[in-house]
């Protein structure tokens, strides 16, 4: 069952929903999205991306891109995560997503308990991807986009299982990291990766 569109602000107000995917993984970018929905073109079945099947997310991804008034997918790269830390990199990526919208919203509703610095008012909504349709839509765009990227990395860096765990610190990933060493897409600032780098640097076996 999808979210109720009566939960959003009045249709005359342009509200952007903003969400992120990829704060916890050991590798890859953190990906964000901002979406302004069109009240005259409702999208049925919007919900927190984690509560939807992959097939449903893929279908909704295309529908959101087609029907939304405006949408933007943005990111902060591994190098930025390592330089800034994951929280600040996430805020930067959210800022980029909102700034990339072709329409300027009157309000940005951010999933979570922190808001990035924006040119318009912002409101943090804890578990917003389960409450606010625009945030749910943003969560779907961000997750599908990042999952596709992880599937591509699976082919570039075989043996790590990236396409399955999406970079999260699962036992499979940690074992592969210890056995194969880190790749260029791993986040050096995260402890398991840093430890793997130190071990491999001692042996001169860092991948390039």
UniProtKB/Swiss-Prot annotation:
A Gene Ontology term for the protein's cellular component: cytoplasm
Ranges where the RNase H type-2 domain occurs: 13-202
UniProt-listed SUPFAM superfamilies: Ribonuclease H-like
Catalytic activity from the UniProt record: Endonucleolytic cleavage to 5'-phosphomonoester
CC cofactor note: Manganese or magnesium. Binds 1 divalent metal ion per monomer in the absence of substrate. May bind a second metal ion after substrate binding.
Binding annotation for a divalent metal cation: 19-20, 111
The protein's name: Ribonuclease HII
Gene: rnhB
């Amino acid at each position: 069952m999808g979210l109720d569109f009566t939960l959003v602000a009045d249709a005359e107000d342009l509200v952007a929903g903003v969400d992120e995917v990829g704060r916890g993984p050991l590798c890859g970018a953190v990906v964000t999205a901002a979406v302004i929905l069109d009240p005259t073109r409702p999208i049925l079945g919007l919900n927190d991306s984690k509560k939807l099947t992959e097939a449903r997310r893929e279908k909704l991804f295309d529908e959101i891109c087609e029907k939304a008034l405006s949408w933007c997918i943005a990111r902060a790269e591994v190098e930025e995560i390592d330089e800034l830390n994951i929280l600040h990199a996430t805020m930067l990526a959210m800022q980029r997503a909102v700034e990339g919208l072709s329409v300027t919203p009157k309000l940005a509703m951010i999933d979570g308990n922190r808001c990035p610095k924006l040119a318009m008012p912002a409101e943090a909504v804890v578990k917003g991807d389960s409450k606010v349709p625009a945030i749910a839509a943003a969560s779907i765009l961000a997750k599908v986009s990042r999952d596709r990227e992880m599937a591509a990395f699976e082919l570039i860096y075989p043996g790590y299982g990236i396409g399955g765990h999406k970079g999260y610190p699962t036992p499979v990933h940690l074992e592969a990291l210890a056995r194969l060493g880190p790749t260029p897409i791993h986040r050096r600032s995260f402890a398991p990766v840093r430890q793997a780098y130190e071990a491999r640097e001692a042996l001169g076996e860092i991948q390039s």
